């Protein structure tokens, strides 16, 4: 709950979300603050300490999807000579775990650990569009900061965008977090239940033509990786 709240939570707000008393909520938060896992600001609002994000990144790097995705993504990076990334959503943030860059006809892996608001980047939108209603509502119900003129900063705009992403199967970012003139496209990696566990993306695309050219192979890679995680198996078993 703290992870999904960019503005933090007060004792009363946490008590309401946990359906418990204010005294219980207060004791819990006080214990977490004392242990250094939660920070309290001057307005007595509470936020997760940065070490939670560090632990989250470390845990995410052990996800099986990374081992499955790497060879497929390396292949498409070499073929199209365009950098790509693998990301997950934790709380309200998209955490970029790894990127692959073309290098002398090969693909070079680089470990990342930076975060971007999930609603303001292609991987985040791709994951949110295929997440549970509860996960989407946690983002939609929070204030959405406008980083650039392109940022989807209202509930209505973001809801429409996520529906579009879900229908077409991929997300596009045209400078919604940092407008440097380049584009990015991302597709979700789906588990056996059809929920997104990660996203892969092409970034640094310089024009609309490059964007449209690379979407089909990106979608194909997403489908291949998702199938490796069991997506579609339940349907095939029923039909078969």
Where is each model-derived feature located?
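Short amphipathic alpha-helical signal-transduction/dimerization elements
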Residues: 3, 124, 128, 132, ...
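Charged catalytic carboxylate motif
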Residues: 24, 51, 68, 157, ...
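Short, ordered coil/turn segments that flank beta-strands lining enzyme active or ligand-binding pockets
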Residues: 42, 90, 192-193
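Amphipathic alpha-helical effector-binding/dimerization core
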Residues: 47-142
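Intrinsically disordered, low-complexity polar/acidic regions
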Residues: 147-148, 179
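Extended hydrophobic
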Residues: 154-228, 240
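Signal-transducing coiled-coil/dimerization helices and immediately adjacent hinge/linker segments
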Residues: 234-240
